[in-house]
Amino acid sequence: MKIGIDLGGSHIGIALINENNVIVEKNEMDIEKRENIENEILAVIDYYINKFKQSNQIELIGIASPGNPNNKDLCISNIVNLGIKKLDLSNIYHKYNIPIKLKNDSKSAGLAEFKYGSLKKYKDAVFLCLGTGIGSAVFLNGNLLQANKYVGFELGHIVIEKNGEQCNCGKKGCFETYCAMKRFKEKAKKILNITNITSEALQEEIKKNKNNEEIAKLIDEYINNLIIGLSNVIDIFEPEAISFGGSFVYFKDLFYEKLVKEMHKRRYTFNKDDVPEIVLAELQNDAGMIGAVI
């Protein structure tokens, strides 16, 4: 058995996974940027490893996280959306003496979708996780592209607006600054004067107010910015398909049909003959946990 851990920008998921990469048991909880969040995360990970280990032979612990994974030192640095400069997992390894494999969260989720989900029938594809930020994974000829330091292909940080809005990475005008679902939801809540609300309830409120001039403008701007970002991705990689994951999936009724229609209508790419298939992630929150142990 293996333990797959997905540390996202707003949640942590921990699963017990069998030899066929099927989840047997899982637990999920919300987290947020705050003081000492590193210690809280390590405590949660420690608790569930100990729990699963009591009745299972654990051969691997896979951890998918935003930031820069360093498997040599067992550290993850620059988890910017949680304000974590360095998350040190070496003590976990020394305590349990179980191999630990660190991966980028979006690349882990993309790998799971590529092998078992929405992208399994394609050889050339791009996975975009639109949530707290925009994470990405790129597949060419059936292989996940990896940069020299396992950090590259950060498509969320392609600049789509010169001197645009400030991004957490330090640059301005990044793709994720305009198209991360967190930003969209924040703007929608401000327009509708709503504070505490779930994503599902917020989507219903937006649907009810779809004729609201500001909401309609917000949706149009979001789709327009998404197409600009996608045009860069398509021109660079020429994928057969692009899969959207993250909370974008829960808002598909607002965006999906209109996005596909506008993509085919505008053909805002160098090669105007072929438009990649736009698909939605199938594994949802399970993808990161599964991909962490592949």
What spans do the regions from the language model cover?
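Conserved A3 ("GATE") glycine/threonine-rich loop of ANL adenylate-forming enzymes
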Residues: 10-11, 108, 132-135
